[in-house]
Amino acid sequence: MSAVEPHSISLRARLAAALLLGVVTASAGGATRAAEDNPRVRLVTSLGNIDVELFEQQAPKTVANFLRRVDENFYDGLIFHRVIAGFVIQTGGYDQGMNYREPPGNVVNESSNGLENRKGTLAMARLSDPDSANTQFYINVADNAHLNATGGQPGYTVFGRVVDGMDVVTEIELADTTRKAGMVGVPEQPIVVQDVERL
């Protein structure tokens, strides 16, 4: 009967662990590099800054559309017009006078990209038509699995995540709201997107 000596087991275990660590480190390094390559933007709001990483590989059309609007200063001066605690904070459509800013065009739905509506992610708002998203987006303030694509049915396209400024997101979420211009969840004191800039 052959036996494996204890020091041999130890050596093999160390080698296996080293190889595994190398694989994990390489994978983590790849993810870090990919994250560093992702475009980032800063939402300068009247309550503070929110820095966002955009998932260009998973949602290329959505990110391209969003960055185009950023470069056109489309979002400057708009408000968070829909604030629902425990759900979402939404912007991209109305100014302080509740005047609707007409979007330039729609973007195709990319909700089957594997990204989920989790707390801290950004996703596109839309109507019942899956391809009706344009400029309005929201930040999830909770995990909202019911907004994900499921069973072949399209959901709401996730295209980014907050990397800094979740305290500002929470402050917006907890703002006192009212009904205004036929909409619920409008902050009593306007919370303005003063600028959106690339980082």
Specify the residue positions occupied by each region the protein language model found.
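Cyclophilin-like peptidyl-prolyl cis-trans isomerases
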Residues: 2-5, 10, 22-199
